[in-house]
């Protein structure tokens, strides 16, 4: 979204991403009963396969369309998780038949594709041309050269009880 000043997702793009595709079953096979219900895992696999098959675009248009797709998918995945976290197996919080005193149940019960469409719409609304050349990069902070107006850092979650540097990243974030 930082660099993209004109490429938006179309309704045809959305239809293509939501088409049936059984090419992958990675999430379904590896994360059953951990984060999402079986049909939701299959939905994630379907959308991932369709994102990877967006080869009817090229260059930056393809790059930006995929970025919007991943953004919407990742946001939909986050919003469907209890407390938006992936560090524990707590699908039961969503599936338990108990009275709830907070509004997340409505969000959790809403279909993935509806969240996905909403985040596509949100991303499209944030595509604009400010007349400046914006650049986003994904490199080590130690390799950044030049002068920048904004630097966003997203360090991993650290485990303060780790015995060495290889154990510092919390192993509970496999998804």
Where are the regions a protein language model picked out?
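Charged, often flexible domain-edge or linker segments that flank or initiate folded functional domains
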Residues: 1-17
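Conserved S-adenosyl-L-methionine
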Residues: 1-3, 164, 169-172
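SAM-dependent nucleic-acid methyltransferase catalytic core
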Residues: 17-152, 156-166
């Amino acid at each position: 979204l930082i660099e993209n000043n004109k490429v938006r997702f179309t309704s045809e793009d959305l239809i293509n991403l939501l088409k049936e595709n059984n090419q992958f079953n990675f999430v379904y096979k590896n994360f059953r009963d951990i984060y999402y219900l079986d049909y939701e895992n299959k939905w994630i696999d379907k959308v991932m396969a369709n994102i990877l098959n967006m080869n009817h675009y090229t260059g930056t248009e393809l790059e930006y369309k995929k970025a919007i797709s991943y953004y919407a998918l990742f946001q939909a995945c986050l919003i469907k998780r209890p407390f938006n976290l992936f560090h524990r197996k707590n699908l039961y919080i969503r599936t338990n038949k108990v009275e709830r005193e907070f509004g997340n149940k409505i969000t959790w019960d809403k279909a993935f594709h509806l969240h996905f469409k909403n985040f596509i719409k949100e991303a499209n609304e944030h595509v604009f041309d400010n007349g400046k050349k914006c650049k986003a990069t994904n490199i080590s902070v130690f390799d950044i050269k030049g002068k920048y107006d904004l630097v966003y850092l997203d360090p991993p979650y650290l485990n303060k009880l780790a015995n060495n540097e290889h154990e510092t990243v919390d192993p509970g974030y496999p998804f």
